[in-house]
Structure formats: C-alpha cells, structure tokens
C-alpha cells in the first residue's frame, strides 16, 4: 500500500513538473521526485543505505544543476501557483480514494499488513539486513553498483569541465 501511494505521488509530481516555469520550482520538484524514488528503492531493496547514497549523489548533481541554471536564468520573482497546488492535492486524494473504492479489502490488508510488520520487525531485522547486503553485490544487482560508479565518474568529469575558470558559463563571483 505504501508503494502504491509513493508511486501515485511520483506520478502527480511528474505531471506538475510539466507545468512549472521557474527553474527553482523545477529543481524543487526534481528533488522531491528524487527523494520519493530513493524511498521507493529503499522499500524494495529492504535496506536504505543504498538509497541514501543514491539520494546524496542526486543531491550533488542537483546542486551543480542549480548553480548552472541560476547563472543562466533571469532574476524574476518566484511565485507559487495555489491553483496548481490545490489541484495536485485534490488529484492525490481522489486517486487514493479511488484505490480504496476499487478494492474494499485493501483497507483490511493495509491494517493487517501494518500489524504483521510491527510484529515481525523486531524478530527479523538483524538477519534480513545481513542477507540483503550480501545480495546487493551478487550478480544481478552488481550491475547497478557498476552503473552508479560510472555515473559518479561521469558527473565528476562534467563538473570539472563546467567549472573551469574561463571555459564555463558560470559568472565570476566577486
């Protein structure tokens, strides 16, 4: 159920992102989308340290993009559209209500699932973390780790190339 709600919020944020015009609001939506994606990754993998590292990497990339876009954009005032905010909240609540109306046993499953998670959380925490950390470096998931290493290296090269003193689009800081 939690996964379904997070995916719904990600979908709504994706639709809102297309309506944004200011770079600051786009960055905020992208940061929120990244946070929710990392949260969803942590729920699926059952350990949150990988999603924490992924979030820090994307946050570093977002800071670089923020500096780059801020140096190129004009100095216009940032205003929030309350119509868009209320519309997105309304869509979120309607979609959540729609999920509950479609499957009435979903509420019962949600409540029993929470009770079972509370019961089994203390018993299996240590053993599950050891098994899931071992699984991360085995064959299918080691490709994600290699992709992450390559992404970090590429981000490092692009950052060094962009921020050279006389070659980049950044304004000089006085």
From Swiss-Prot:
GO terms for molecular function: NADH dehydrogenase (ubiquinone) activity. This is NADH-ubiquinone oxidoreductase chain 6. It is found in: Mitochondrion membrane. It is a multi-pass membrane protein. It comes from Anopheles quadrimaculatus. Its EC number is 7.1.1.2. InterPro entries: ComplexI_Subunit6. Keywords: Electron transport, Membrane, Mitochondrion, NAD, Respiratory chain, Translocase, Transmembrane, Transmembrane helix, Transport, Ubiquinone. It catalyses: a ubiquinone + NADH + 5 H(+)(in) = a ubiquinol + NAD(+) + 4 H(+)(out). Core subunit of the mitochondrial membrane respiratory chain NADH dehydrogenase (Complex I) that is believed to belong to the minimal assembly required for catalysis. Complex I functions in the transfer of electrons from NADH to the respiratory chain. The immediate electron acceptor for the enzyme is believed to be ubiquinone.
